[in-house]
Amino acid sequence: AILFSAPCGTGKSTQAELWRIHKGAEVINGDKAGISIDADGVNAHGLPFSGTSGICKNRSMPLSAIVILGQAKENRIRRLNGAEAIMCLMENIYLDFIAPGEMQSCVDLLIEMLKTVPVYRLDCTPDERAVKKLADELKIGN
């Protein structure tokens, strides 16, 4: 699974739909996903709310990458280092669900996840060119 992360209105649902159309991807949630780490690795989970997309499937899939989205006129992608990745991810976590005093546990989980899951920054256009740019970077075929 590829998880798109961004503030509301940036284009998560748009990029997910483009991947569905151009790469045959299955979208398990159009807004937010849960993430777990277990003996089998890092997994993304559909959640029972979907934002504006209406897509929320009760599915889990191995997480292969997280992509922080930004809007741009030209497509640019780069892999984020650990500190950059944690900062970007923390901006998009539902902090309301983290109990007081548990923030360090959340950061520790992110650090563990980053050992196997790369995080990218994709500043992109809302069209097929963005899909191609990301697919090329992730080495995903047609």
Question: Can you annotate each of these PLM segments?
Answer:
Residues 2-6, 20-142:
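Glycine-rich, often acidic-flanked micro-motifs
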Residues 12:
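Conserved lysine of the Walker
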Residues 15-16:
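Post-Walker A alpha-helix
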